[in-house]
């Protein structure tokens, strides 16, 4: 066992310290270790029962670590020149689903892209291409708004929306534009007051 691992284990054992100043110091150190501390925290949560306060503190520390990871990834994403929409959507979804498999989302996006690509050709007008896109995206793959649980947080998580085919208008539009741009169709989001719409931006 290396020094870092032993330090994490020692800190985890101090989580139930009744002195708030000690706990805050321990919490800060564990957050600094980042995701490397999570397996030790989860193991202690499962195997060591020192009461409800102990377990609640562990849960909160894990959430704090995950939040810091997501925050840093989003800061890097906003600072990047590319600002890949799919990557950004996955980062946001990982706040709710930290263990989600990126490859499943990429593969699902690629499969839909292929279905549409097979029916497109250069002789079609923009209107015809969008009509084909809509038929496959909404008709074949059944993407639609979630009218029953419109305000559910999971409707903003791209992994859930890709699986259920239901989500809020923003994420449905996001997925639509991601696939369109992968097909070299110039469809981009336009942020209007209280609305987010898509537009075909043909120069």
Predicted regions and their residues:
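A structural boundary/capping signal
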Residues: 1-203
